[in-house]
Structure formats: structure tokens, C-alpha cells
Amino acid sequence: MTIASSTASSEFLKNPYSFYDTLRAVHPIYKGSFLKYPGWYVTGYEETAAILKDARFKVRTPLPESSTKYQDLSHVQNQMMLFQNQPDHRRLRTLASGAFTPRTTESYQPYIIETVHHLLDQVQGKKKMEVISDFAFPLASFVIANIIGVPEEDREQLKEWAASLIQTIDFTRSRKALTEGNIMAVQAMAYFKELIQKRKRHPQQDMISMLLKGREKDKLTEEEAASTCILLAIAGHETTVNLISNSVLCLLQHPEQLLKLRENPDLIGTAVEECLRYESPTQMTARVASEDIDICGVTIRQGEQVYLLLGAANRDPSIFTNPDVFDITRSPNPHLSFGHGHHVCLGSSLARLEAQIAINTLLQRMPSLNLADFEWRYRPLFGFRALEELPVTFE
């Protein structure tokens, strides 16, 4: 059975959840095709969690290994831990994890607070702002660039690479996006290789220098180090930007929940978790079966692709009471927005911290925050929940 490509319309982008419900009603593991991508589409929570934990389901790069047209892009993707299986994934993750331990993440808090206030200072007197370009994107950019070790004068370039390369891993990628991504991959790889050479000569307190310390011991190649930086730049931008902007929209669309958070800012932790569940920044992740696997009443054959719809799993009524209700006091809230198992998001604690500080500070400094008279739209991406822009007003 084929899923009609018309579901990639603006209606689907605005609200994919009714589509997810339709699939789940047929079977939580549904065999079909979407935008010419055949495979198993998983909408059930238990099924999604089970597959994410099962090492027999492997990751692979979005571009076929035999692809020759976009060789540079394919080469960069092949070096990223996101598309590595064990033991290489564990090796790369261990090397990068030092920048994202709970203690290290907590140490970023003063810089995040300072940056949030600086960005809000720029718009406070204008009585309006565009949440993404004025606030969420520059915040995410400053923070991840600071962690990686990218100089301030190069951060605009980092944003451009991240915006281009994210499109190359989505279902909706076009030849134009892949061609541009191939060019950006060359530029980003060359840039980070040069920066790595500088850090070899002059180490600093950043992630590049940290990766170089562990390079010889764990046989980290220069290209793996550069690709790790590129991956974290992409993830550090997209996840955080989408989390903050989606959260602001959710709260403004649900004034009773917004009032609850204003009256009790200590609810920010559960509020961010509910925003993650309700509008997951990452809507889909993929795996491929390494052998014939019987799971949840179906047999997935070796080589078949499995698409895990995280946004659907987060609204599975067998796990979440009233799943379509936005409730910032929801607890427990075991959403899968950051994944599950070995590939759980490395920077999840950082994204949470940025969102909590950004949202609470925004609400405190702009107590009359409202949505502008504007028809907001989502970027044409299937795997990510990403607003194009979000204008707001305030007194």
C-alpha cells in the first residue's frame, strides 16, 4: 500500500498527527511507501522503543554507499557517529561525550544566560521579534560554536552549513539540495581540518582540542574529528532552534498553560519535556534490518528499511493519557524525542538547558508576549518539526 505523496502538502506539514493516527490504527508497524521511500513505518511507542534498543537494526547513511554523484557529501556522512554502528559508534561517542557530561553542561549555564539576555536586549525596545532569526538560531549558534571552538567571526558560516546539510538527510531532499550540500560538505570539511591543525599547535578549552587529546589512543582520524564537529554543528543548531521555537508556539497557543508557567516558573522542566513530546523537533529516525527479524507480530526481512516516527510514538494513547492534550505538568513523560538506546541524543542535556533558560527568560522579560497576526508555516521537511519563522509582539 502506498502513502500518497499529497500528504507532504502544507496540511500535512501543519499537522502530521492525524496521518500518524491513521497509520497506527491499521498497524503500529505499517508496510508502505512515502515519497517513493518504501519500508516499514513505525508509529507505536513500544515498537519504536524496542527497535531503537535492538542492535540487529542498524543505522546507515541517507545516501547509498555506491553513490558517486555526491561523493564529498557521502564521505562526510560516512564519518559521522550518527551513521556509525558498533564498535565505531561507541568509540566516536566516547571521545565527544566529554563536552556533554552533566557537570560540563552545567558549566555552560552562565554563557547561555548571558547570551539569552544579550539577544533579548537587541529586540526589547522594538516591541516585536522573530523568534527564530532574532533569538533561537543565534542562541544555538553561539552556544554550539563556543563549545566546538569556532571563532566568533566564522559563526555565520557555521549556520549556513548547518541549514544546508540538514536538508540532505531528509526525505524531501532534492537534487538541488544534494548538490548544494555536496559543496557545503567540501567547505565544512576543509574548514574544520584547518581548525584542527590550529588546535594541534595551540590547544584551547574546546571540543576540538578535547578530541585531539584522545585521537592517538582511540585511533581517531582527522576526517572523523572534522565530521564529528560538522555533525554537532548541525544537531546543535537544528534540535535547539526547533525545540525553542516549537515550545514558544505551543505555549502561546495554550494560554492556560502559559499562565500556569508564568505563575510557577519552576515548572519549566516538565514544560520543556511536554513541548518535546507534543512537538518533537526530530519526527523520524531510520534503521535497516541486518537479518530477518520477527518483532511485534511482523517479520522484517534483511535489508528492509524501518522508519521510526518519533512524533507518532510520543502520541501513542497506550502510553500517554490524552496524548493530543498539551499539559506542562505531565509526569511521567517518557517521550522518545531524543531517541533511545545506543544512539540517544548526545546533546540532550544541553538542548534542555538552553530551552529552559531561553523560555523562562523570554517570558519574564516579555510578560505581554503574543503571536503576531501571521500565518506561520513549517519548513518542508518530513523528519524534522521546524517552523520557517515565528513573529511575536510584546509591550
Curated annotation (Swiss-Prot):
- A Pfam family name for this chain? p450
Task: Extract the GO molecular function terms from the UniProt entry.
Answer: heme binding; iron ion binding; monooxygenase activity; oxidoreductase activity, acting on paired donors, with incorporation or reduction of molecular oxygen
Pathway of action: Cofactor biosynthesis; biotin biosynthesis
Which catalysed reactions does the entry list for this protein? a C2-C8-saturated long-chain fatty acyl-[ACP] + 2 reduced [flavodoxin] + 3 O2 = 6-carboxyhexanoyl-[ACP] + a fatty aldehyde + 2 oxidized [flavodoxin] + 3 H2O + 3 H(+)
Q: Detail which positions bind substrate.
A: 60, 169-173, 307
Q: Where does heme bind?
A: 89-93, 285-287, 343-345
The protein's name is Biotin biosynthesis cytochrome P450
Organism of this sequence: Bacillus subtilis (strain 168)
User: Which lineage do the record's taxonomy fields give for this organism?
Assistant: Bacteria, Bacillati, Bacillota, Bacilli, Bacillales
